[in-house]
UniProtKB/Swiss-Prot annotation:
Localization per record: Cytoplasm
Chain positions covered by the region annotation Domain I: 1-63
Location of the region described as Domain II in the Swiss-Prot/TrEMBL record: 64-142
Region (Domain III): 150-200
Role noted for this protein: The RuvA-RuvB-RuvC complex processes Holliday junction (HJ) DNA during genetic recombination and DNA repair, while the RuvA-RuvB complex plays an important role in the rescue of blocked DNA replication forks via replication fork reversal (RFR). RuvA specifically binds to HJ cruciform DNA, conferring on it an open structure. The RuvB hexamer acts as an ATP-dependent pump, pulling dsDNA into and through the RuvAB complex. HJ branch migration allows RuvC to scan DNA until it finds its consensus sequence, where it cleaves and resolves the cruciform DNA.
GO biological process annotation, one example: DNA recombination
Gene behind this protein: ruvA
Entry keywords, A to Z: Cytoplasm, DNA damage, DNA recombination, DNA repair, DNA-binding
Region (Flexible linker) residue spans: 143-149
Gene3D superfamilies, A to Z: 5' to 3' exonuclease, C-terminal subdomain, DNA helicase RuvA subunit, C-terminal domain, Nucleic acid-binding proteins
Keyword Chaperone among UniProt keywords: no
Stated name of the protein: Holliday junction branch migration complex subunit RuvA
Protein family (similarity comment): Belongs to the RuvA family.
Organism: Staphylococcus aureus (strain JH9)
């Protein structure tokens, strides 16, 4: 229904962004809102997919058509909902996920929150041979720098989460420096470490 939303990126939260267009602010759930950070207060185009449930209508947004297509493929798998699909795409590119599927790499897939061995196997069974590994979408509006790592993303998402909890940028400046010196297995782990640093 909504192929994309184009407008001013007004707000950035750990799980979603807000884009204002024609006087309306659209709340858009995203895999990794940090990827949009450099566009805050500027015009942005976000590819979208509207999912209607009994209790809500949710708009999901993506940095490229390839990412959007991967999301739509994942939510067709039994046991995979939008939340799990977003978690997979939060720290992996579509091609990385496709390679894991084609190589039947269950171990790679089970590293994501909410994805157990049974669900990982179902992803492979349902999608192997149906997802094509291609060059990353060349017209993607937003690209994560080549030097950006999963660890960088964990830290940046943790910082967004801490800021959303009300901590000031001044308080978080020292925290970010410390977090960047360590390695974490998840965003939650980085957030917990950050909270300990803030209250210490």
């Amino acid at each position: 229904m909504y192929a994309y939303v184009k407008g001013k990126l007004t707000h950035l939260y750990p799980t979603h962004v807000v884009v204002e267009t024609a006087g309306v602010g659209y709340e858009i759930q995203t895999p990794n809102s940090y990827r949009f950070q450099k566009h805050l207060d500027h015009e942005v185009l976000i590819r979208t997919s509207l999912i209607v449930r009994e209790d809500a209508q949710l708009l999901y947004g993506f940095s490229s058509e390839e990412e959007k297509d991967m999301f739509l493929s994942l939510i067709k798998v039994t046991g995979i909902g939008p939340k799990s699909a977003l978690a997979i795409l939060a720290t992996s590119t579509p091609n990385e996920v496709k390679r894991a599927i084609e190589n039947e790499n269950d171990t790679y897939l089970t590293k994501f929150p909410g994805i157990g061995k049974k669900t990982a196997r179902q992803i492979v069974l349902d999608l192997k041979g149906k997802v094509k590994i291609t060059e990353e979408d060349s017209d993607s509006l937003l690209q994560v720098d080549a030097t950006s790592t999963v660890q960088d993303q964990f830290v940046q998402e943790a910082m967004l989460a801490l800021e959303a909890l009300g901590y000031s940028k001044r308080e978080l400046a020292k925290v970010e420096k410390t977090l960047n010196k360590n390695k974490y297995d998840s965003v939650d782990e980085a957030v917990k470490a950050g909270l300990q640093l803030v209250v210490s």
